[in-house]
Design a protein with these regions (language model features):
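Conserved N-terminal catalytic core of the sugar/cofactor nucleotidyltransferase
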Residues: 1-9, 33-106, 110-118, 123
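Short active-site oxyanion
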Residues: 48-51, 129, 227-228
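Hydrophobic packing residues within well-ordered alpha-helices of enzyme cores
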Residues: 18, 61-66, 121, 185, ...
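Conserved alpha/beta core of the MobA/IspD/sugar-nucleotide pyrophosphorylase nucleotidyltransferase superfamily
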Residues: 3, 167-254
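A residue-level structural signature of the nucleotidyltransferase/glycosyltransferase Rossmann-like core
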Residues: 51, 103, 110, 143, ...
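Conserved beta-strand segments of alpha/beta enzyme cores
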Residues: 25, 74-76, 150-153, 217-219
Length: 254
């Protein structure tokens, strides 16, 4: 691995949308295997370090869950005191990832992410750029508008945007060079408008800013399987991830 990569997992959500009562990263898939274990298996071979951002109430349980990896130095943990959104979680943890060349951001509920996608993203990434795996979706929840090497816009259903059938959606993975990244986030915050529904300054609209204003070229890694975009937001999503794992057909196998 020519570049030093730090994977960062924002996992400070409370799991309220799913009604689980625990952070989604700690939900059991089967036989003691949690979402965390699946993510770690996929990320560790392609990253030098994994950093996880948790909520105050999630810190102790997660440290227990990942005790072995933390003790080995392969994993570190920080706390997002207030749920201000993914951007706040990622950049609040900047001291942990800034020593590395590249940050590989992965949402903490992406149980269906394949090892092949992680490998291809890291291989395609260039330090100064922005690399995002995208997949066409029949009914996307988030849609990316791309023009050549530029990311024009990210539409978000959660903020009232209309996403078009067949549009490109992410799989919860974003690869960015760390040099100057926190400075660009600070600049972005000066004029960034809060989401019309959530009231949060979201991370996803920061990506078109990086592409168009900061001049970071976009590399799209095509993904064929739309199931990789399926996080765990509902009981149906959780059932899907569990059934795929038990069949041995979750992306990349066990």
């Amino acid at each position: 691995m020519s570049e030093r990569v730090c994977a960062v997992i924002p996992a400070a959500g409370r799991g309220t949308r799913l009604g689980s009562g625990i952070p989604k990263i700690m939900i059991e898939i089967a036989g003691g295997v949690t979402v965390w274990h699946l993510l770690y298996r996929r990320l560790r071979p392609r990253s030098e370090h994994v950093h996880v951002v948790v909520s105050p109430e999630g810190e102790a349980p997660f440290r227990d869950l990942a005790a072995e990896e933390i003790a080995s130095g392969a994993v570190s943990v920080s706390v997002q005191d207030e749920p201000t959104g993914m951007g706040g979680a990622i950049f609040g943890a900047a001291p942990h990832w800034e020593p590395y060349d590249t940050i590989l951001v992965v949402w903490g509920d992406q149980a269906n992410l394949s090892p092949a996608t992680v490998r291809r993203v890291v291989a395609a990434h260039r330090t100064s750029g922005l690399t995002v795996p995208l997949v066409p979706m029949a009914d996307p929840y988030v849609e990316y508008e791309v023009a050549g090497s530029a990311l024009v816009r990210v539409r978000q259903s959660r903020e009232g945007d209309e996403c078009r059938p067949g549009g490109l959606s992410d799989v919860g993975v974003f690869c960015l060079g760390t040099d100057g990244l926190r400075k660009e986030w600070t600049r972005y915050l000066r004029d960034a408008a809060p989401g019309t529904v959530t009231g949060e300054v979201n991370f996803l609209p920061f990506l078109p800013y990086l592409s168009q204003v900061a001049g970071r070229p976009l590399t799209v890694v095509p993904v064929d399987d739309p199931d990789e975009a399926r996080g765990i937001n509902t009981q149906a999503d959780l059932d899907f991830a569990r059934q795929a794992y038990l069949r041995g057909t979750e992306p990349g196998g066990r």
